[in-house]
Amino acid sequence: PIRIERYVSALGHTETDVYLAGTQEWSVGTSAEPFDMESNLALVAGVSAASMVAVEAAMRKAGVKPGDRVSFVGHSQGGLLAARLAESGRYATSSLLTVGAPLGTVTLNGNYPALAISHSDDLVPELGGASKPTGITHFETHSGAGTLDVAGAHAREQYVATAERVEVSPARDSLPHWEASGEAHPQFFQARRTDR
């Protein structure tokens, strides 16, 4: 669930984009999968999580060093991870994009373009607490999923469709803009817990 792309921007900067998937395993304390419910609980509480350790290990393996320019993108648990990494102070965060992420316990400094997309019928973003952090632009809309389709409202595919609608809507003009450039070289990482 970890994708890392490195490239040289038009301005000559080495840039890294880190894409993080959501929860892969719903158990607590029994799975070797670090993107599990145990990591969800730890991340919402603001303490160390196995998924965070896995992402930072993947970043090191991809050649990312402290202080490097990094853009973080994530869905659900991956979005919460992205926000925590963006604010960790270990990287020069270029941007942050989260979708369906429970961000209520995260404090964002606002020193970079940041966008949180959520669905009004998705319960997961509310699991982080009722407050919405400052320092990030919030875009909320209905998912388009069925009336009682709670899982559908949180599905990555629904968020892809929402992002496509945002791209062509007038709301796009009020959202943060990112400049894409350079040829990216993707690397994919799968992590396992070694303590189980």
Locate each region found by the language model.
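Gly/Ala-rich beta-loop-alpha elbow adjacent to hydrolase catalytic centers
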Residues: 73-82
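Extended hydrophobic-aromatic, low-complexity segments
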Residues: 82-83, 107
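Alpha/beta hydrolase fold serine-hydrolase catalytic domain that processes acyl esters and thioesters
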Residues: 1-68, 90-196
